[in-house]
Amino acid sequence: MFRKTSLAAFAGAMLAASLSPASAQFDLKFALDWKFEGPSAPYFVALDKGYYKAEGLNVTIDTGPGSVAGIARVAAGTYPIGFFDINSLVRFRDQNTDKDVKAVMMVYDKPPFAIVSLAKSKINAPKDLEGKVLGAPPPDGAFAQWKAFVKENKIDDSKVKIEAVGFPVREPMLADGKVDAITGFSFSSYFNLLTKGIKEDEIKVMLMADHGLVLYGNAIMVNPDFAKKNPKIVAGFVRATIKGIIDTYKDPEAAIKSVMKRNETADEKIELARLKMSLRDNFITPWVKANGVGGIDDKRMQQAIEQIAVTYEFKNAKPKPADIFTPQYLPPAAERKL
């Protein structure tokens, strides 16, 4: 009798131990920069495959207001973790010295900031924008880099008419010829134009990173108070997200299914192509292939800060890479390799 009871107790204890992550789930709100589209697949893959759950996390993923505006939500603690533009974080930190928000994981090693136009506008080089009308949403992450892009390419911006447009009408205005070009994320504007009936060979995408910008793109950033109180939660979220990115890279066709479950009105063919473009151009660069997912090159980050300083007047001392990005929550490099 004693043996049976002991065995039963032992089995129960082992079962409890094996279920402990699931039974102590921490509710965590995570804000994307934008809609549930192809490039958001890694987070939903991590959710569907139980990677977050294995870290003891019950993650809720919400859409966001753009890659710039959401930073304030993380700073305020509305969302403890978010996915936003690291260059805008540099400026935000300078303007809000009491908000020690830091990036903890780089996602877009090469930013998707782009100038998108139609072939008929004959915008083949940056200076071709002179004399044109550029449609730009004020909260757009790409437009946030406009001044640096102008400086690097010696554009006379007095000859470029900037027209403030909303995100919903940005691509329609370009398609209708109401503006000559727009700022946007490459994989967003390109495929949005395809859905408007514009042919592939009529769409011109000019990546700012191919024209002088050394900037990074969107990163995972964390509220400082939350990170201080919950370092294991942050590390677990980062670890699970990296697994989601690696799985998405290995099998984008399977990964896109996780997006479609949350956005049934989307066109799966378009979203898969959007995902593949972002993986090729933004997520998985030669540097990431060599060094793994999630980290940064401090020298490049310092160059990016210097580039921001060309067109942005810092109120305080220019930050160092360590002021903006911390690798302390990243898993070992071996776990981040593709």
Predicted regions and their residues:
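Bacterial N-terminal signal peptides that target proteins for export
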Residues: 1-9
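Bacterial N-terminal signal peptides
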Residues: 8-18
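Sec/Tat signal peptide C-region and signal peptidase I cleavage site
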Residues: 19-24
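Short, glycine-/small- and polar/acidic-enriched structural segments
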Residues: 26-176, 180-187, 206-208, 213-214
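Periplasmic-binding protein-like
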Residues: 107-117, 200-226, 238, 277-283, ...
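Short, surface-exposed acidic
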Residues: 157-161, 200-204, 265-277, 314-323
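Secondary-structure end/capping motifs
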Residues: 228-313
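Conserved C-terminal helix/tail region of periplasmic/extracytoplasmic solute-binding proteins
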Residues: 301-338
